Amino acid sequence: MPLICIVYFLQYLDKIAISYASVTGLRESANLHGNQFNWVSTSTESIFPDCSTGPLSKNNVCDTSLDPVSRAKSLVAAMTLEEKINNTKYDSSGAPRLGLPAYNWWNEALHGVAEGHGVSFSDSGNFSYATSFPMPILLGAAFDDDLVKQVATVISTEARAFANGGHAGLDYWTPNINPFRDPRWGRGQETPGEDPLHLSRYVYHLVDGLQDGIGPERPKVVATCKHFAAYDLENWEGIERYAFDAVVSPQDLSEYYLPSFKTCTRDAKVDAVMCSYNSLNGIPTCADRWLLQTLLREHWGWEQTGHWVTGDCGAIDNIYADHHYVADGAHAAAAALNAGTDLDCGSVFPEYLGSALQQGLYNNQTLNNALIRLYSSLVKLGYFDPADDQPYRSIGWNEVFTPAAEELAHKATVEGIVMLKNDGTLPLKSNGTVAIIGPFANATTQLQGNYEGPPKYIRTLIWAAVHNGYKVKFSQGTDINSNSSAGFAEAISAAKEADTVIYAGGIDNTIEKESQDRTTIVWPGNQLDLIEQLSDLEKPLIVVQFGGGQVDDSSLLANAGVGALLWAGYPSQAGGAAVFDILTGKSAPAGRLPVTQYPASYVDEVPMTDMTLRPGSNNPGRTYRWYDKAVLPFGFGLHYTTFNVSWNHAEYGPYNTDSVASGTTNAPVDTELFDTFSITVTNTGNVASDYIALLFLTADGVGPEPYPIKTLVGYSRAKGIEPGQSQQVKLDVSVGSVARTAENGDLVLYPGSYKLEVDVGQDFPTATFTVSGKEKVLDEFPEPQQNATSAVTRRGR
């Protein structure tokens, strides 16, 4: 008997609390704070040391009148060599002799407090769930810096509550700010997109929200920018991240792979950085003194109190076991420590630092410095302070999953959803019967992506349809990556009995994830076959595409039987409800693609291992700056209304390189304001809507060849523009955004003629400006090492 579930709800449904229901086998919305999803739970106790009566109280680390470095030095000075080495691992053992408890540095909070490692969730009751926001790729599609900070602020509050409740540590290994360079990358979902300016602004506001300010003396939690650097390959065609050598030119490194990290460390003053699995130009990043010392700490000035570097988990082992950069564990431990890695998310440091010291591969002060950096961070976090003296120690369970947090998770999801096609099918008519078909039709945890924790509930598409007054016919039809058509007949039967058909599919973490890249960028399995058959029914058909990476939508865009197409990423707890807000017109779509949607053939034109951005004989170019044959371009997104854009001035300036490069503040000159460009955005349609103004710069003939097609230099999200109304939108452009990167990696302001354009796929007016004078170097890029020998002597090779 075919499984076609028809859901009827009585009028009193809304009067009762249902968060997990089974109606003829149909889940509407999963309540996750129970045992059924098998989240790990551990017994907990306070993570904080006893600085009042215990043996640690006699150490100056507990003296709140001293500065963090002095306090940390006092603690480290009291440790034996064995105790020091035992505390260089992520799950540090502490020092019972001193009254120093164990501490787990490995905590995750990519889009909400995430289960595992240092973070535990209870089976029920307090600390059994946390707010689950959309994955960064969908949050990035909102192009809303204020929203990013608001989300990060809630995450840090809940993270601090978990720490205060004994369920987590105080530092979190987030965010992932590697640019989404290749569409096959399995972890692109963890990033806000492909553009370095967008990533930089995202991370600045995220760190601001997570740490509660820019370089605060007392951070709420510690954020960790990862993975430093040029990391964006998992396991492609048998090439694994653990042994991959990313060969990157100084120009591409400075221009594309590093800006988000520069912003994170130099400007946002994050407290921690994670070095990555890969090698960079022959040197494992966690053993790369140029990367961790010359560039990071010296050139970017990231030497403030309590700033530390952790290796990715197992990365120090990879130095010798996979990269074969040194002969053994002792040399790998010394190479990483000497380069500036302070903490090992692995076992090489505790196992081999003793032997390495005996061999004279590093000195004791280098070890002390690493520990001082780590414990200075904990001092800043108030780890050793009385609870009454700490502004964040009072944060508790009552500040987790608040109504405001629920509302924000919903808002963030709605803002990010992108409409890729609409022939008038949307918004949906109210009421009636909808058939919801596909592998995401009744998805719950599948909507979360990765690095997730259990929320209180997850709203499915079916739950949302019912709560919007629709009768629902449900059939999965097929799986994400199946070639079986056994469920097609059931799906077609359900669709025939409905007024409207919604197909919910795409890709999930069985297709893309950490340790798993894609080899194709097509819709997997036979999903397109089922969509094709549904489209032949000549009923209104909407496709909702889930997943972090894009798939080639060419056939759906060309199919007249597909009336509308939405991309919803990984929307997490508010997923179904937010999607239906867009489908029904309760909210107007305004998100923009944060990545390029490439044609399926792209993967045959360039290997993932080619890190080059610019087009060449064996590379068609990467990202919207260098590739112009996209199925859908970076920044694409449709609305329920129409807009017109006009410039306040057709020509700006003039500008001179001397005056622009001289700066007006003590901030790095590349961060200073070049100018604020104003446009007028008018809603010429019939639906109130947000509008994301994307400002691109073109300058053929300016700077080194080849010239980028265009470059994003600013953006702003205008909120709630009513029909017939206009808003003035101001777009701040920094000096660094106008500059270009020379072949040696220097950031240079070039004289010449420049053109500004707004949006993609529109024929809006443009504006121009001219920069006169001589070339001005804004930032001299430190000369990278090339295939250098290790920081310790290589042996046995």
UniProtKB/Swiss-Prot annotation:
Glycans are attached at residues 86, 126, 364, 431, 442, 483, 644, 787. GO terms for cellular component: extracellular region. It is found in: Secreted. Its EC number is 3.2.1.37. InterPro entries: BXL, Fn3-like, Glyco_hydro_3_C, Glyco_hydro_3_C_sf, Glyco_hydro_3_N, Glyco_hydro_3_N_sf, Glycoside_hydrolase_SF, Ig-like_fold. The active site is at residue 312. It is an enzyme of class 3 (hydrolase). The keyword Cell division does not apply. One of its GO terms (biological process) is xylan catabolic process. The keyword Iron-sulfur does not apply. One of its GO terms (molecular function) is alpha-L-arabinofuranosidase activity. It catalyses: Hydrolysis of (1->4)-beta-D-xylans, to remove successive D-xylose residues from the non-reducing termini. Residues 1-21 form the signal peptide. Keywords: Carbohydrate metabolism, Glycoprotein, Glycosidase, Hydrolase, Polysaccharide degradation, Secreted, Signal, Xylan degradation. Pathway: Glycan degradation; xylan degradation. Its main location: secreted. Belongs to the glycosyl hydrolase 3 family. Xylan 1,4-beta-xylosidase involved in the hydrolysis of xylan, a major structural heterogeneous polysaccharide found in plant biomass representing the second most abundant polysaccharide in the biosphere, after cellulose. This is Probable exo-1,4-beta-xylosidase bxlB. It comes from Aspergillus oryzae (strain ATCC 42149 / RIB 40).
